[in-house]
Regions:
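An N-terminal structural lobe/cap that precedes and organizes the functional/catalytic core
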Residues: 1-69
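Generic structural hydrophobic/aromatic packing signal, biased to beta-strands
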Residues: 3, 20, 103, 179-181, ...
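Short, low-complexity, polar/charged sequence segments that are solvent-exposed and flexible
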Residues: 34-37, 75-78, 199-200, 207-211
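Short N-terminal signal/transit or membrane-insertion segments
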Residues: 1, 21, 30, 110-126, ...
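Charge-rich, low-complexity amphipathic helices
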Residues: 28-30, 38, 78-82, 86, ...
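C-terminal, charged low-complexity interaction regions
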Residues: 121-240
Length: 240
């Protein structure tokens, strides 16, 4: 495979081994993979170092470092304050656009290796406008980007890691339009389509225990509050 950002015309350094899901969001040295072409039938535990693919050149891979670091900060905050110290109140401030671009990059990575199509593993070629939004100072049309989905988070059943499901636009022959994803039990959506997605997402219904028809969905939220009657409030402030 070629670098999926080659459309920019500035590739350099040859193809590098890119973690298709940022290694910084994980705590250990091993992960459980499932749904990819080589583990489509049952979960397989692999080393974190093995969860890579040559899908980006060295230059473009390295330019994602600030986005990966922002996602790692969120992952560590959730692990430390939901799992390890649930009783205390805690707050973190993150850069919203960096987190959004990390989510969009992960969506494009997974699409490029066929990870958004667990049945046929068809590969998704990144759209040029999305690639330019990631690497250049262009603005994405409103509606494209990160959404937060409300729902319960429990330290008793807390999971470190990332899970995802593709979102398909049935009015466009089932074309992949984004993905739902859960990072350390907090639910998000990244949309690749223009226009408000809240009503479209509500029509998804029940997916992996999350009822999108009842959840509240917020585009580019400024504050995410994890509330509890028995634990301290955790607040994620996003600067946009």
């Amino acid at each position: 495979m070629d670098c999926w950002a080659a459309v920019l015309g500035d590739c350099a350094g040859g193809l590098s081994r890119e973690h298709y899901i940022s290694d910084g969001i994980f705590d250990g040295e091993a992960i459980t993979a499932y749904g990819l072409e080589w583990c489509k039938d049952h979960p397989i535990q692999i080393s974190l170092a093995s969860a890579v693919s040559k899908i980006l050149c060295k230059r473009h891979n390295e330019r994602f470092s600030p986005f990966d670091a922002e996602a790692a900060k969120l992952s560590r905050f959730l692990s430390a304050n939901v799992l390890d110290d649930p009783l205390s109140e805690a707050q973190i401030t993150l850069r919203g656009y960096r987190l959004e671009k990390w989510a969009l990059k992960t969506f494009l990575n997974l699409g490029y290796i066929g990870g958004l199509d667990p049945e046929h593993h068809a590969r998704l070629k990144p759209r040029e406008d999305l690639v330019r939004y990631l690497f250049q100072e262009t603005q994405a049309p409103k509606g494209i980007g990160l959404y937060f989905v409300t729902g319960a988070v429990s330290n008793a059943k807390f999971n470190v890691g990332l899970s995802w499901n593709a979102i398909r636009n049935l009015s466009r022959d089932g074309a992949i339009a984004g993905m739902t994803f859960t990072l350390n039990d907090v639910r998000f959506v990244v949309s690749a389509e223009e226009g408000p997605a809240e009503h479209r997402l509500a029509k998804i219904g029940l997916v992996n225990g999350v009822d999108y028809s009842r959840a509240k969905i917020y585009y580019r939220p400024h504050n995410i509050a994890l509330l509890s009657k028995t634990a301290g409030q955790k607040t994620i402030a996003l600067e946009w």
